[in-house]
Amino acid sequence: DINCFHEIDSIINLSGASIFRIWTKKNKELILKSRVQSLNFLREQLIENGVKIQSIVSASGIGAYPSSDEKEFYETESDRSNYFLADVIKEWEKATSSFEIIAERVSIVRIGLVLSSMGGVLKQTMQPMSFGFGVYFGSGRQWQSWIHINDISQIFIHIIKNRLSGIYNGVAPNPITNYEFTKIISRVRKFVLFIIPVPRLFFRLIFGEMHIILFKSQRVSSKKIEQSGFNFKFPNFRSTIENILS
């Protein structure tokens, strides 16, 4: 119903099937099409009905960046990962950029690991802790760029209210290693006796190609969104976990 766009100035796009599923051919198609085709359909409907908007802000992912234990990644990074999810993100952002013909401003938010009490990566990390132990991936040295769900929600609103455009990283200012990620959660949760490393081979056997995302090391910068005037309510990982689990 095109009437749903009556008096709408801005659109926030969060559509897309979960990437945390076995990457079969069918699931790969679902992951890609749920992001790209939904945007293309929306754009075509707006064009056909002569609807102009002030802005669109669309989700994307930090999976666009390569993997590195040393390098910090900014929005201007030109190097890209060479695997399925990076290809999806390329097409996803291309579909978002196509809105430039009908929107005054187009923005993309490359989102990190979203922490929430409603599920996702935090719930998955805590599952083995119910049995008294936590696990980290391989060496545990890989960087993980995370963000509290409240902060990522506010970033989208901040971009619209401040009439921003372009690409922004949706991550908190203080990324941590996978080992520290697991250790801090286990300490806040309590009753976790020990944490153990699980070798990459195990995850490859269980998850297939999808295991790659568990071992990506991406230390992503939040400076650009901060320089635009955004203030994080949850910049610290431990206080974030305490807030969510309280």
Predicted segments with their positions:
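Alpha-helical substrate-binding/gating segment
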Residues: 126-134, 142-176
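Glycine-rich "substrate-gating" loop/helix at the edge of Rossmann-like oxidoreductase active sites
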Residues: 80-85, 112-119, 139-147
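Conserved Rossmann-fold NAD(P)-dependent oxidoreductase catalytic core, especially the SDR/UDP-sugar
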Residues: 40-82
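Mid/C-terminal beta-alpha module of Rossmann-like enzyme folds, strongest
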Residues: 162-209, 242-245
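Conserved beta-loop-beta element that borders a ligand/cofactor-binding pocket
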Residues: 60, 94-117
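C-terminal amphipathic/interface module of NAD(P)-dependent oxidoreductases
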Residues: 212-246
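NAD(P)H-binding glycine-rich loop region in Rossmannoid oxidoreductase-like domains
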Residues: 1-37
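Glycine/proline-rich active-site loop of Rossmann-fold NAD(P)-dependent oxidoreductases
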Residues: 90, 102-104, 115-124, 158-168
